[in-house]
Amino acid sequence: MKRISIWLIAIILSAVAGIFAVQIASAPSPEEIQITDTPVSNDGNCAYMWAYHNAPELTEKLSATFLAIDPVITVRAEYFGEDCVYADGHSTFGAMETDFYIRIPVDDLTNEEALGNWMSQVLPVIVQLPREEIQGKYGFVEFTFEKTETDRAIVRVPIQLYINSNGITGAKLFQMFHNFP
């Protein structure tokens, strides 16, 4: 009885495999794709590319503000967005967010309280900028605390998360964003 059932299973599997083989062999072949050269017109289509653009007026304004707080702080503002690059080479820029880069020389990279206090001095200045000076949405503030050229800590703070943090300062502020993904 066992032999008959084994033979029966083998015959059924062979029949099913044969049916699939016939279907595949008799399937119509795909149409051949023909490529033709067509002239490209500059009808407004463009290729989008991620881009950063300096914000010199905003950088200058913030530099003057931070000079009054502490002359060791350096700042740079940039707009992040997309360049729409046309076939003829010209491009237009659309800002998606405004980002800020802050460099502060420090003596001790392990003093989280002091680093957080630096952050709590700088962040309110950024948040209080008139909304019309910010292109796109709030981006981030990237702090580079620099002891030497190679010994530094970089902390990136998403501005909206800072706004939602309800006035945290000092070590808690630093720790909140130091290992933030």
Language-model features: locations:
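Polar/charged, Gly/Pro-rich intrinsically disordered segments
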Residues: 22-23, 51-107, 131-181
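Second-shell loop/turn segments in exported
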Residues: 44-52, 102-119
